Structures are given as C-alpha cells and as structure tokens.
Swiss-Prot record:
Family note: Belongs to the DnaJ family.
UniProt note: domains: The J domain is necessary and sufficient to stimulate DnaK ATPase activity. Zinc center 1 plays an important role in the autonomous, DnaK-independent chaperone activity of DnaJ. Zinc center 2 is essential for interaction with DnaK and for DnaJ activity.
Cofactor note: Binds 2 Zn(2+) ions per monomer.
Lineage, highest ranks first: Bacteria, Pseudomonadati, Pseudomonadota, Gammaproteobacteria, Lysobacterales
GO biological process entries: chaperone cofactor-dependent protein refolding; DNA replication; protein refolding; response to heat
Residues that, per the record, bind Zn(2+) 2: C153, C156, C175, C178
Record's keyword terms, sorted: Chaperone, Cytoplasm, DNA replication, Metal-binding, Repeat, Stress response, Zinc, Zinc-finger
Annotated localization: Cytoplasm
Protein name according to UniProt: Chaperone protein DnaJ
Residues involved in Zn(2+) 1 binding: C137, C140, C189, C192
Amino acid sequence: MSKRDYYQVLGVPRTASEDDLKKAYRRCAMKYHPDRNPGDAAAEAAFKECKEAYEVLADTKKRKLYDTHGHAAFEHGVGGGNAPDMNDIFGDIFGNIFGGARASRRGADVGYMVELDLEEAVAGVERQIQIPTLVECTHCHGSGSEDGHVETCGTCRGSGQVRIQRGIFAMQQTCPHCGGRGVIIRNPCKVCNGAGRVEDHKTLSVKIPAGVDNGDRIRLSGEGEQGPEGVPPGDLYVEVRVREHPIFQRDGDDLHCEVPVRISQAALGDIVRVATLDGEAEIRIPAETQSGKLFRLRGKGVRSVRSRTEGDLYCRIVVETPVNLTAEQRKLLEQFEMTFAGEDARKHSPKSATFLDGVKSFWDRMTS
C-alpha cells in the first residue's frame, strides 16, 4: 500500500522538535479518533496513519533511519519494531507467480498538501512547490558501493527472492541475506551509507485544475521518491486544502452567502447588489421579505471539475436591526411603532403570530 510522507501526515516540517511532533500527534489523534468518528472507515485509517507516523518520528533511531532511507528503511523488517505491511508479505509469498515481486518494486509515493484561496480553487492555478525526496546518490551513482563494486548475493543468486518448501507448498519470499536487493555491498558508499539514495529537495510546477475542492488529490506520476537500484520512482500526490472565505461557503458546486438588508428595504422591497466570484449581480427583493429568505442566482457557483457544469449561488437575506441611531431616527421609529397601537400583531408580523398561536396552544393544553 502506498504510504504518505510521515511529516506530511502529521503536518510538521522535517525540522520539527519532539514537542512539535507530540502536539501534532495529539491534534491528529483527537480529530480522527474512532470514538469521535464511530463507523467512519476513513477516519479510522487516518488515525492509524497518524499513529504509525508518530511511532517512527518520535523514536530518535527510527527517525534517523526514516530521514535517510524513507519508508524503505522499514520494509521487510529492517529498522526493527514496525510490523510489515500485509501487502508486502503477500507480495513476497506470491509475487513471483505474477512476474516477481522484485521486478514490481518502485520508490515510495510522496504526499504534499497545498493550500488555496477559494478564488484559486474555482479558477485553477499553477503553483511552484518544493518537496523533500530521495534521489539517486551521485557519489556512487545509485550502486550503494564506495568503489562501485557489488557482489551478487550467493543465497538468492541475484533475484532477491528465495524459494522455501513447506510441505507440499513451494513459496517465494524475500531473501533474508540481502534483504531483497539481490546484491551484497562490502564497502558501503560514505555519502549514502549504502542506500544508493540521498535526501534532497526538488521544485515542481503543479497545474491545479479549475473547480477543485477540499480533499481532492492530484497525481503526478513518477515524481515521488527514487526507487532503490534504479527501479522506477513512486508518484507524488498533491492534496488540496481550501481556506475559509470571508463571504462564501461552498457546498459541492454551489456557493452560499448572507446578504444583509435594512428593515426598510425588506419591508418596502428594493434592488440590492451582491458579490459573486466573477463580479457583482443584482437581486430584486420583493416587499415584505422576511429574514432567511433564499434567492438563487443560477450559474454563479463553481464550475465542476468533473462534469464542467456550473453550480448556483444561494443568497440568504438577513434583515439587520439598525444600530447607532441618531435622535431623529429614534424618534421616527418610535412614531412608526405607535402606528401599530391597537393593531392585531397577526396582521403585520406573521412569525410573531405563529409564535403567539403556539404559546396559546401550549397553555391551553397545560390548563385543560
């Protein structure tokens, strides 16, 4: 199974201190803990991923191994303490039936998170990102040997696999002598310590398509970690996180916003201008509009990244109570209020009428 970079999982830089790691793990654990997300398989998987990342990075020796060799440091039991991936186990046993496990090996996948403004997510954007990765050691040219000399493993004869007979079953598994590499290095490279790869950073240009949303992932084939002994590199997965917008809330391809209006506008009707992602639009508010009324502007939402259809913009009216009144404004409002004296509230205030009817019905039931 492809694994994300442990630092990316916890959301910390590679220079993070022990306290930073502990705080990041606590946040992650609280967010994805199964007790907080009952029945959520995705949250359970994320919790296990956070736990695995912290167990490695919180251990000084394991962290040093991981920083040098990446996930490869813990494959096939190397590094100690970590349980092997079940997919790797079955790959060791049955891999050669389908062409050999060693032939299918490649570098680890890498995860990266990019934050966008809503406008960038809607319109699409090109971003330059710098990612930590493992690349071929230029000192030994990936051989892992200081003098360039490697010996073919005598146990597996260079295949990286050994055949084991268990009763009537013959199985293939990773060679315990060379760890699946197929070669023995007597004089390890002083730069990469025999790994054949070193840690580096590379800058990539990522084109993020219009319409992406929170959690969407973009796959860049072959931009992950370089595999050992020249095998193909893994992939890079760029995950999108969209920042909160001060005006709009996104729901799929639709957008929602609140439009404040004055009492007089709501009572008498008016035309108000509202912001959209591509400028402004007008809403005609009829007289006697109540707070909470929704108006839909078709096609003013987000263009879907998959179907290319456009969502809508829903504007919710919020009737505001005026503040900081002048003496004259207060006097006019008092005069306006006096015009309701003796009037039935049901005539002018439909919600008040409903409320009063509910109160009366409640007390009638209580006293009957």
